[in-house]
Structure formats: structure tokens, C-alpha cells
Amino acid sequence: TPLYSSAASDVYKRQLHGLANQECLKFVLEVRNHFNGTPTQDELKQFCWDRLNSGRVIPGYGHAVLRCPDPRFTAFMGFGKDHIEDDDIFSIVESLFEVVPPVLQEQGKAKNPWPNVDAASGSLLYYYGLTDFNYYTVLFSISRAMGMIAQMVINRAIGIPITRPKSVTTEWIKNNV
């Protein structure tokens, strides 16, 4: 239904989901442009410290739930290592994975210094020719929609009834939330 579709996808329009891989890729491109290519690990470490000391974050690092590298990040990195050769952007992503977690641990503010899926996904899209950032959220949403559709098919196949949450009024929400 339209309501279900909207409820399922509207969460991706905000920056934390909707723009996350774009922001990560913009950061990687900023690094590449700053150093005219791939920096050394020492240069990258200083660049990250300068960014943190100016009050900004390192995009793609930290996850609300995970306390280890995001398994999706690990899968994307494995794919990139197997299929991408001599690419500055992917090399920077690899170097960031080695540099950023220790920097964030030393800084002491991050509960989770590990990369999330967005730290790698944008670099793969960019490498394979999708350079218009406006489509990144579309692909993210489609991947989520495919998962929801698959779950709906499985639910129908095994006879699980349609879920109809109890309806509440706006007044109830105001009083109880």
C-alpha cells in the first residue's frame, strides 16, 4: 500500500541514511584532491586529525548499533580488492580503514570507531561509472525495497497473515509519545 511504502522508505531521505555514502565519497574525493592522489598513511592521519580538531567528523565511521566493522563494509572491501586495481579512490578507502579507527580511539569520543557500509559503497559506485551522487540514495532504497519484497513473498508462501498494526489517532500520539 502507499502508506506502507512511504513508511518504509521515508527514513532514507535524511542525511544519516539518504546522504551517507555521498558524504563519504565526497570526503574521499576531498582527500584525493588535497593530496593530488593517494596520500601516505602519515599524511592521511594528519588530515584526519585536522578534520577532527576543526569539529568535523570522519564520514563513514561509526554505527549506531555495531561495535565492529560493518559486515557489509567488509564484503564491499573484499569485492573491491578482488575486482579493482590501481584506483586512487579505492586505495584511499583502504588506507582510511587502517588509519581512522586508531585515530578515533585515540581521540576518545567515538563509541564505535569502525567503518560502516557507507565508507566503501560510494567508492565502488563511483569506480563503476555512477558518478552522479543523486542516484546513490535511489540504489540504497531499491536494495532495501528488494529485501522488504522478498520478506513479503516469504510471508505469503508460508501463510503468515498480513500485519495490521493497531490504528491510533493523532491525539493519542500527542498524549502518549
Where are each of the predicted segments found?
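Internal, well-ordered alpha-helical scaffold/interface segments
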Residues: 26-29, 74, 78, 98
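C-terminal domain-closing interface element
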Residues: 63-84
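Long, well-ordered mid-to-C-terminal structural blocks that present hydrophobic/aromatic surfaces
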Residues: 13-68
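Single conserved hydrophobic/aromatic residue that forms the stacking wall/gate
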Residues: 1-8, 12
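Transmembrane alpha-helix interface/packing and boundary motifs in multi-pass membrane proteins
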Residues: 10-15, 105
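Acidic, carboxylate-rich catalytic segments that either coordinate divalent cations
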Residues: 38, 50-56, 73, 82-177
